[in-house]
């Protein structure tokens, strides 16, 4: 497993899977990669990958709608790096199919309230539960209520369906299973593109009915199978809006400036810190999906001149990032590591856990 962060975080399913490529695949630690995948798939319950384990008795905790869906992307990346289809077929494929089956029929384990609606979109959570990564809660007060049809969850759902269909074809599974997966994926993509585009803000809704500008929409472009076609103007508009409103040298802000409850500085007592956690504070790990979305737009561009222009802008983004984090790694609060989050105004002070796995990985 992977520890989410020091000094206080333990091993979390969501954090482990987001950190998976950067910590084990990039370093060619494929034996560790297999062990991590086996760890977080051995306790799947009703289609849910554990989001963690109790620090008291080590029982699995299932307070997450995204951990199971993140698994598919990491399995795909594991294959991309290793071509190890045998391991996936023998140890993971049946479990992946069962996750799809459970999400389709509905899951109410630990009040996750996950179900596939008639419009082929996944709905999850309630006013009382927090099961996405924006999970701050103060007592009974949910700071960022995101119950309903979340943008990143449905992007991950489409991606999961397409990856499973790809594996089903590779493993010569039943033709009916392959066709069902592809049909469901096509219907999900159609519905997503019809409902999630926010024409007014030139981006995607964070949750259907919620027009706050947040970075979660990047997952619609960053995954192996983007639910938004990277060639389209919608994709470019969305990416430009995120770049303009949320990107800075240290990561992406969790909420655009000007939105209600926007907060730039992470400070004060535990209540004030929790209130601001996902309300404008900068998170470095979001640079990962931002970069992947950027690359997918570049790969999809047909115009040679425009592609060259995009490549030039991407190189400038990478160089600026290298400069920022070379200094941070050598002169920051934690030499050799990257913090959990940063303030969103100068001097962009590092805050939260002083060594965060997904910050380093992404």
State the predicted function of each range:
Residues 102-103, 160, 164-167, 188-195, ...:
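Short alpha-helical functional segments enriched in proximate histidine and acidic residues
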Residues 154-190:
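Active-site neighborhood of glycoside hydrolase catalytic domains
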Residues 1-11, 35-56, 108-149, 187-285, ...:
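Extended glycan-interaction surfaces of carbohydrate-active proteins
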